[in-house]
């Protein structure tokens, strides 16, 4: 009797051990799946808290109708201006408030070259400012300005995509606007953006503060160095000043890598900063350079061939010709 009881106890213990081992195996499998999913879906390029969290890390392509409304343009060209070249009061469809804004040299001619039914040029209206925390300039902080611009760009694309699901997109940005457009392009290319990646015809970023060697198409002449946000990523004091330097974009541009162009001039410390370009010990100079100030005439000259040109074309003309070709060859969705 005692022998039977011992056998029974051993059997129960064996079952318990087997169950525990199965639980461990299941936990390992779950951990591996989570790790693999994490590798497939890198975190958003947009700083935390700027956009509401999506329902899933990456979404599949949305179903599309065969037709869209007759009021929908075939293409929407979204332009994100640089610091001090936009405001929330600006009319996105008629941006006359800042007549010297760099990207008007692209969107203006495009609007003249194509009918409104073919392309809508949309300039993101946001508080494009950069507060120097060592001064009393009453400007919005870079973090808040960038967040506002990102939300405005995502809202514009989301609205257009909801109303016109067959419309394609061309994205351009300059300086702070290049960071914003690049972040949104990164999210789109990695399956987290406001539209599906196959709807984006192309992206061009001029003087991108998150420019990184080997990521996107570096349009020659392309200098060495990387964006200031990468060079200064490890300087935590800047975050406390409203100047978070976000480092490389996780996942790069994903599926949009081959469709994303980076234009940067030699000597522009915003997009081509050598490793020792900024001195955290000399904070005033660093902040002034980030604001496009000291030693930065290069940053303001992309409409001229003086510091950057491709076969004599300045950055704005190169971007205009590139965009014109994309729009000319873009799909012609059916309308009802």
Curated annotation (Swiss-Prot):
Parts forming coiled coils: none
Transmembrane regions: 16-36
Region (Disordered): 44-65
Cystine residue pairs: 72-164, 264-271
EC number: 3.1.1.-
Subcellular location, record wording: Cell membrane; Secreted, Cell wall
One BP annotation, GO: lipid catabolic process
Catalytic residue list: 175, 268, 299
Function: Shows esterase and phospholipase A activities. May be involved in cell wall biosynthesis and/or maintenance. Can hydrolyze various substrates, including the p-nitrophenol-linked aliphatic esters pNP-laurate (C12), pNP-myristate (C14), pNP-palmitate (C16), pNP-stearate (C18), pNP-butyrate (C4), phosphatidylcholine, phosphatidylethanolamine, phosphatidylserine, 4-methylumbelliferyl heptanoate and palmitic acid and arachidonic acid containing phospholipids. Does not exhibit cutinase activity.
Protein name (Swiss-Prot/TrEMBL): Carboxylesterase/lipase Culp6
Protein encoded by which gene: cut6
